[in-house]
């Protein structure tokens, strides 16, 4: 599982011109699910997202998590995080889990996040979405449950 985590002052997502998710201060989280992902991968990424200390404390040091600042999460599925561009010029998405299986894991990931009592908004799985991200910093962290980076 991969996640691109961006610290934001606000973020929103639209489907067919309608806002389906919107947050204030918090994290915009793009989620990619691979063919080999299991519940263990979901829990690993969940724990990283909610405990990453990427918000500044009173000394301007990145020392606070989303839990500490009582921030919000906007979670959006994005299979293109598994685009492999090592060969040729067109991304290969062979490692991305597709369809109902991926949607099931995405929903399970959201359920795990909800256990932390953070306000969570989402995009619409599989939809063509327009995402507005107002980066704070900017601070962008890339997570990978297989620990490739």
From Swiss-Prot:
Gene Ontology terms for molecular function: D-tyrosyl-tRNA(Tyr) deacylase activity; Gly-tRNA(Ala) deacylase activity; Ser(Gly)-tRNA(Ala) hydrolase activity; tRNA binding
Single biological process term from Gene Ontology: D-amino acid catabolic process
Enzyme's top EC category: hydrolase
Alphabetical UniProt keywords: Cytoplasm, Hydrolase, RNA-binding, tRNA-binding
Single GO cellular component term: cytoplasm
Disulfide pattern: none
CDD domains: Dtyr_deacylase (cd00563)
Domain notes: A Gly-cisPro motif from one monomer fits into the active site of the other monomer to allow specific chiral rejection of L-amino acids.
Name this protein carries in UniProt: D-aminoacyl-tRNA deacylase
Organism: Clostridium botulinum (strain Eklund 17B / Type B)
This protein's encoding gene: dtd
